[in-house]
A protein has these predicted regions:
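Conserved acidic carboxylate
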Residues: 15
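Alpha4 helix (beta4-alpha4-beta5 surface) of REC/receiver domains from two-component response regulators
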Residues: 22, 66-69, 92-109, 116, ...
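Short hydrophobic/Thr-rich beta-strand motif most characteristic of the beta2 strand and flanking loop
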Residues: 32-39, 47
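Active-site beta3 strand of CheY-like receiver
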Residues: 51-57, 62
Length: 144
């Protein structure tokens, strides 16, 4: 992503369920975001390093490294530690939250999240990111 104030925010979706991942991708693209994808914990690290997303939408239940392992790796890698994460879980977020408390988690969403909650969580994460000194972003414009 460039540093231009007109740049779209880039979201990395880390979700192993193909249908859900593709549905989330369409919804976010329709809301004006640039989207990249990963299907497991290993890819979540390599894609984040290569693509430099502005926010990560992370499923906690992943093959090849659970979401908690991904959070721990992000926290310990200087080039990834400032990326805000929105956790997406099939469990009650109140149960997932204590396990992730020590990591930088901007928001929790329970599957299936409606589009309004999804976009609000991502925008909140982007505001958090800007407040913590990463490059300023312009939230995507409303779809026409």
């Amino acid at each position: 992503m460039s540093d231009s104030s007109t740049s779209k925010a880039k979201v990395l979706i880390v979700e192993d369920d193909d249908d859900l991942r593709h549905g989330l991708t369409r919804r976010l693209q329709n809301s004006g975001y640039e989207v990249v994808q990963a299907t497991d914990g290993v890819a979540a690290i390599s894609v984040a390093r290569h693509e430099r997303p502005d926010v990560v939408l992370l499923d906690l239940g992943l093959p090849a490294g659970s979401g908690l392992i991904v959070l721990e790796r992000y926290a310990n890698l200087p080039d990834l530690s400032t990326i805000p994460v929105v956790v997406l879980t099939g469990r009650d977020p109140r149960i997932a939250e204590p396990a992730t408390r020590k990591f930088h988690v901007a928001a929790f969403l329970q599957k299936p999240a409606d589009n309004k909650d999804l976009v609000e969580a991502i925008e909140r994460a982007l505001r958090t990111q800007t407040a913590h000194g990463r490059r300023p972003l312009t939230p995507p414009s409303e779809p026409t």
